[in-house]
Design a protein with these regions (language model features):
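Short, well-ordered surface patches within globular domains
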Residues: 79-192, 229, 235, 239
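N-terminal Sec signal peptide cleavage junction
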Residues: 28-31
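N-terminal secretory signal peptides that target proteins for export/translocation
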Residues: 1-12
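Cell-envelope/ECM-targeting effectors and their regulatory/trafficking segments
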Residues: 49-68, 92, 132, 188-192, ...
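N-terminal low-complexity, Pro/Thr/Ser-rich intrinsically disordered segments
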Residues: 39-87
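A well-ordered secondary-structure block
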Residues: 157-267
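Sec-dependent signal peptide recognition
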Residues: 13-20
Length: 268
């Protein structure tokens, strides 16, 4: 009797723990849709700002509809050495540098809803991106930006763009990745001019739009120290050079090289 009673007690206790655990899992699973609800794709602030093929003017107009001070942020608008996508790269940087929290609530929260496990599926884009970390890196970015302070804007540099273009050509011709080659970042930049205080470089591969390229670097999937994100949000970088082109390993979109500096003076 006692043994049977003990077994019955253990069964009831284990069943209670099972139902409590199941309830906890259901509650946690429900958290994500409550926080990151599917966006209304008819509104101006949805993924449409990230659509492929937008001119600088079209991108700026869609951002204006989302309440951004585009005249202030679109610092590359008159840079005739940049094409529209390269101008959009600078504008996309300035969005998140100017108001990280707004960027998170408008765009990162939206991108989170496009993850299915570790696959990222952007509406209207056939290519499916397979990530290593899945949605967790994007959710981390969201909360990180809520705690991030605004920093100064970036302004285009023709000479830094030359350095970026040189490196993009180098890696594309060889079908390789990374920041090495031609002596490294410092040597490449110093062939063109003199930099002050700090320099940095980011590379985005195979992005379907400039907006997506910056978002991809901010999410920084499988980069443990989130170095791309840190550079984009770094205080004290004022100048940026951008180069866009095709990379043979990423034929479904454009690749971008970005060179940053506190200040830069070209050689005479």
């Amino acid at each position: 009797m006692t043994i049977k009673a003990d077994k019955r007690y253990l069964f009831i206790r284990e069943a209670a723990w099972f139902f409590l655990l199941a309830f906890f899992i259901i509650q946690c699973t429900a958290c994500s849709p409550l926080l990151f609800q599917k966006v209304n794709t008819e509104s101006a602030s949805t993924a449409r700002v990230g659509d492929p093929g937008l001119s600088n003017e079209e991108y700026a107009m869609r951002l204006l509809a989302d309440g951004w001070p585009v005249d202030t942020l679109n610092t590359g608008v008159n840079a005739d050495f940049l094409d529209d996508d390269e101008k959009n790269i600078i504008l996309a940087h300035n969005l998140v540098r100017y108001d990280p929290e707004k960027y998170a609530r408008l765009y990162v929260a939206e991108y989170i809803t496009y993850f299915m496990d570790k696959e990222f599926r952007y509406p209207g884009v056939e290519t499916i991106m397979l990530t290593r970390e899945g949605v967790s890196a994007a959710e981390e970015l969201y909360f990180d930006l809520l705690r991030t302070r605004a920093v100064n804007l970036l302004y285009p540099s023709e000479d830094l763009s030359k350095a970026a273009r040189s490196h993009l050509r180098y890696i594309s011709q060889r079908g390789i990745r990374g920041h090495g080659g031609q002596g490294g970042l410092r040597a490449r930049i110093e062939r063109i001019g003199i930099w002050e205080e700090r320099i940095a470089e980011n590379i985005a591969y195979g992005s379907f739009s400039a907006h997506d390229a910056v978002m991809y670097m901010l999410i920084d999937d499988q980069v443990i120290n989130r170095s791309h994100r840190k550079i984009i949000l770094q205080h004290g970088l004022h100048k940026v050079g951008v180069a866009k082109g095709m990379h043979p390993a990423y034929p479904t979109g454009y690749s971008y090289v970005m060179n940053y500096a506190y200040d830069f003076t070209p050689h005479d």
